[in-house]
Swiss-Prot record:
Primary localization class, coarse: plastid
Reactions mediated catalytically: [protein]-peptidylproline (omega=180) = [protein]-peptidylproline (omega=0)
Gene name in the database record: FKBP18
Source organism of this protein record: Arabidopsis thaliana
Name the UniProt record assigns to this protein: Peptidyl-prolyl cis-trans isomerase FKBP18, chloroplastic
Location in or out of the cell: Plastid, Chloroplast thylakoid lumen
Domain of life per record: Eukaryota
Keyword Chloroplast among record annotations: yes
EC number annotated for this UniProt entry: 5.2.1.8
GO cellular component entries: chloroplast; chloroplast thylakoid lumen; nucleus; thylakoid lumen
GO molecular function term, any single one: peptidyl-prolyl cis-trans isomerase activity
Length: 232
C-alpha cells in the first residue's frame, strides 16, 4: 500500500498540471457576466499552430473563381470603339474580329455562315440553335445564301437534307437583310461584327427578344464560299 507521503506527492504533482484560473473577487462579481476569463494553460507550439489555423475562415484559402470557359469568354470580348469600325454598303458599321485566310465572298457567290443576333447581352437569334423538323432537340445548322441576293429567297425551299437529320429551311433562324450584303468581302474563316439599325434589321416588327425598332449586333462567321457558276 502506498504511504501517505507518496500520495501527497502524487496529489501535488497532479495539482500543478491543472489549468490555473484567475480568481474573481467579490467586487468583480458586479461586472457583466459575459466578461472574458483568462486561462493560463501551457500548450505546445504545434497545438498553437492548430488553434491559429482553425480560427482562420476557409474563404481565406479557397477563392471562388469563374470557370475557365467563362474567363476565356470575358477576355475575348471587348468593347470596340466606334471609330475603329469600317463603313460598308448602306452605311453599315462593321469590324473584322478575324480576317480569315480562305476564298473571298463576292456578289453572286454562295456563302455558308453561322450568325448570331445579339441584343444587349441576349442572343436572340442564332444558327447555333437551329431546330430539327421534329423540334425535339437543337443543332448547330449553318445558314446558306447567295451574297447580294434578295433576302429570304432561299427560305422558300421546303426541306434541306443534312447529316443531322431532316431540317426545315423555313424553320431556320431568319437572318436580317444586312447579312446578305455585308458578308461581301469576307474571307473564309473570318469573323465580322456588324451594328445593324432597324431599317437593315427586323424593322418595326422586331424578332424574338429584339424589340421593334431596335439596333442590335450581328456576328457572322464565314464557313464556306462557292463561287458563281461562271467563275468556276
Amino acid at each position: 500500500m502506498a504511504s501517505i507521503s507518496s500520495l501527497h506527492r502524487w496529489a501535488s504533482n497532479q495539482h500543478s498540471r491543472l489549468p490555473r484560473i484567475t480568481s474573481i473577487s467579490e467586487a468583480d462579481q458586479s461586472r457583466p457576466i459575459n466578461q472574458v476569463v483568462a486561462f493560463s494553460v501551457p500548450i505546445s507550439r504545434r497545438d498553437a499552430s492548430i488553434i491559429l489555423l482553425s480560427s482562420i475562415p476557409l474563404t481565406s484559402f479557397f477563392v471562388l473563381t469563374p470557370s475557365s470557359s467563362e474567363a476565356r469568354e470575358r477576355r475575348s470580348r471587348k468593347v470596340i470603339p466606334l471609330e475603329e469600325y469600317s463603313t460598308g454598303p448602306e452605311g453599315l458599321k462593321f469590324y473584322d474580329i478575324e480576317e480569315g485566310k480562305g476564298p473571298v465572298a463576292t456578289e453572286g457567290s454562295t456563302a455558308q455562315v453561322h450568325f448570331d443576333c445579339r441584343y444587349r447581352s441576349i442572343t436572340a437569334i442564332s444558327t447555333r440553335e437551329s431546330k430539327l423538323l421534329a423540334g425535339n432537340r437543337s443543332i448547330a445548322q449553318p445558314y446558306e445564301f447567295k451574297v447580294g441576293s434578295t433576302p429570304g429567297k432561299e427560305r422558300k425551299r421546303e426541306f434541306v437534307d443534312n447529316p443531322n437529320g431532316l431540317f426545315s429551311a423555313q424553320a431556320a433562324p431568319k437572318p436580317p437583310p444586312a447579312m446578305y450584303f455585308i458578308t461581301e468581302g469576307m474571307k473564309v474563316g473570318g469573323k465580322r461584327t456588324v451594328i445593324v439599325p432597324p431599317e437593315a434589321g427586323y424593322g418595326q416588327k422586331g424578332m424574338n427578344e429584339i424589340p421593334p425598332g431596335a439596333t442590335f449586333e450581328l456576328n457572322i462567321e464565314l464557313l464556306r464560299v462557292t463561287p458563281p457558276p461562271e467563275e468556276k
